[in-house]
Every structure is written in structure tokens, then in C-alpha cells.
A protein has these predicted regions:
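FIC/Doc superfamily catalytic core
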Residues: 1-179, 183-248
Length: 248
């Protein structure tokens, strides 16, 4: 895709998203993206629902019979992801800021009983330190300043795929929320692609090892080459999936 084709693709995609979202049409690219995004982004975080189960939940609000018991949290977070995606569309006219990011977290997590029972901050930054595996993240008291610095840096850039890769890697190091950082981070990526005429993408769970290694590479040496390469691969996959819905 060249720049002209990408811009036309994003414009067409947005047009279909809003038409289908407002008319509650789940049969097109909006519904497909909702299902694919919720499945992959949650699966990366060890959600156990299959794509078929998520599709049924989105289309009808009903889960099919299963030999394996459903975990309530998996269902709650999947429903939250659907709502977070809609919030992303609703806020596209506004420049990314901390309030928008917090609103994504609220939509994702406000219906999750376990998080509320654990007294996690919902729609607000974390109150307790957390880690990524064995790696320390930004302390709760330092998160507001760290997020301000990150957003100030971001808005001073000419936005490109490399810029988004660095933003995402830095966001994940801050880990501003008690839980849900990866999913809010990935919805931000999709949103900012749409806002800046960059072909959007969904990180597939099948590419989770590559994704985690790319984030690790940034922590170790500050490079985003591996992450950008992954984003490009995911762009191609999502674009190819979208072509079906745009065929005459």
C-alpha cells in the first residue's frame, strides 16, 4: 500500500465502522473487527474464550454450550472489550489524552467483579506497585507525571508506525493501570492509526512470543525495530482480511 491507498483504506474503514456501529450491524467489518480484536487482545492476556464463543457473545449475547466451564472474568472482560472498542470510535475526534486513556480502562474493567473485589482502581491509575514478569514498572505515585511526559513527547512527534511502536513500548513500561495495560495499550494503537491515516492492525495471539520479545528488546536497548516489523506484518494481515468486506 502506498500513502494514497492507505489514506483511502482508512477513510473507507472508518465510514463502514460508523455506519455499522450506529445501525448495530454485526455482519460486516465492524462486527468482524470487534470479534477479532476482543479475541486476540484478551487471549494474549490468557482469556480462555474461543473466537467462536466470542462471536456468539457479540452477536447474540449468548454463549454456546461447552464441556469446559466458563470463567466469569473471561466473559466480563470480553464484554468490556466490546464497549471499549465503541468508546474508541466515540472519541476519535479528540487528541489522545489521559482522560481518554482512563475511559478505555473504565469500559474494559468496570464490569469485572474480581477487579472490584480486589479493590483495583477502575478507570484510574494503579494504587499498588505491579510488575511485568520480573520487571519493575513505574511506581503509582510517579504514574501521572510519567504519562504526562509520554503524551507530551508523543504529541510533539510526526506520527508514524515507528512513533506508535515507541509509544506502546514506553506505555507498557509505565504500566499505568493495576491490570488491563496491554489491552488499553493495543486499543490506543488501533485508534491512533485511524486518526493518522496509518493502516490499523490487531496483534494476533499467534504472534504473542514475537510481540513479547519485541517489547523486551525495547526494555533492553531502546530499539523499536522488532516491534515495528511486527506491526507491519499485522497491518498486512488485517488489510487482507478487510478486502473481503470491501469487495464489489
Amino acid at each position: 500500500m502506498n500513502a494514497t491507498n492507505t489514506s483511502a483504506f482508512v477513510k473507507h474503514l472508518l465510514n463502514r465502522f460508523f455506519i455499522e456501529y450506529k445501525t448495530r450491524d454485526h455482519s460486516g467489518i465492524y462486527g468482524y473487527t470487534q470479534k477479532l480484536f476482543a479475541y486476540n487482545s484478551n487471549k494474549i492476556e490468557n482469556n480462555n474464550l474461543t473466537l467462536e464463543q466470542i462471536s456468539s457473545l457479540f452477536d447474540s449475547g449468548i454463549l454456546p454450550k461447552s464441556q469446559v466451564p466458563y470463567q466469569v472474568k473471561d466473559i466480563e472482560e470480553t464484554q468490556g472489550h466490546f464497549i471499549m472498542f465503541n468508546k474508541m470510535l466515540d472519541t476519535l475526534d479528540a487528541a489522545l489524552d489521559q482522560q481518554i486513556i482512563k475511559s478505555f480502562h473504565f469500559e474494559l474493567k468496570s464490569g469485572v467483579f474480581e477487579d472490584r473485589a480486589n479493590d483495583y482502581a477502575i478507570g484510574d491509575y494503579k494504587k499498588r506497585p505491579n510488575m511485568i514478569s520480573i520487571h519493575q514498572t513505574t511506581l503509582p505515585s510517579q504514574v501521572p507525571e510519567a504519562m504526562t511526559e509520554l503524551l507530551n513527547w508523543y504529541h510533539a512527534q510526526d506520527i508514524s508506525l515507528e512513533t506508535l511502536a515507541e509509544f506502546h513500548a514506553r506505555y507498557e513500561i509505565i504500566h499505568p493501570f493495576q491490570d488491563g495495560n496491554g489491552r488499553t495499550g493495543r486499543i490506543i494503537l488501533f485508534r491512533e492509526c485511524l486518526r493518522h491515516d496509518i493502516s490499523p492492525f490487531i496483534i494476533e495471539d499467534a504472534n504473542r512470543p514475537e510481540y513479547l520479545e519485541a517489547l523486551k528488546a525495547y526494555r533492553q536497548d531502546g530499539t523499536v525495530t522488532a516491534l515495528t516489523t511486527l506491526f507491519q506484518k499485522e497491518q498486512e494481515f488485517y488489510f487482507n482480511q478487510c478486502e473481503y468486506f470491501f469487495a464489489e
